A protein has these predicted regions:
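Active-site-proximal alpha-helix that buttresses catalytic centers in soluble enzyme cores
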Residues: 2-130
């Protein structure tokens, strides 16, 4: 996670801003075996998702799941992928646009970003963009 202490981007007296981070669970970058492997490894390594003890789960994940599931998952993702990319990311960007439009009618100095728990853009990248 990024550190925001001593942030050189902050300028004293520049006025207050409010940041809004729109988050979601996440999506792979593309519907390919390699992208799904990266995404599934991140997602399925989270102890809040898989509560099996790490000593038991790690060999299953790395020995079986990540060698079989990405190709199957890529096929499923390809069936829902659009020209705009991931449906989840596309709809999240659309929601952000509508939220931004609504809020900017009433308030100023609001900055917006998207962050995903798994995949890109990550929550820490979203926070950095604020």
């Amino acid at each position: 996670m990024a550190s925001f202490k001593g942030n050189k981007l902050y300028v004293h007296g520049s006025g207050l801003k409010t940041g809004i981070l729109i988050t979601n669970l996440g999506t792979p970058d593309e519907p390919t075996k390699s992208s799904l492997k990266t995404y599934l490894k991140q997602f399925l390594s989270d102890e809040r998702v898989i509560e099996t003890p790490k000593a038991i789960w790690w060999p299953i994940l790395n020995g079986i799941v990540l060698n079989t599931r990405p190709a199957k998952s890529a096929k499923n993702y390809k069936s829902v992928w659009t020209e705009e990319g991931s449906p989840l990311l596309f709809h999240t960007k659309n929601q952000l646009s509508k939220i931004k439009e609504f809020i900017n009618k009433k308030y100023q100095n609001i900055v917006f970003a998207i962050g995903m728990r798994y995949g890109n853009p990550s929550i820490s990248k979203g926070l950095n963009n604020l």
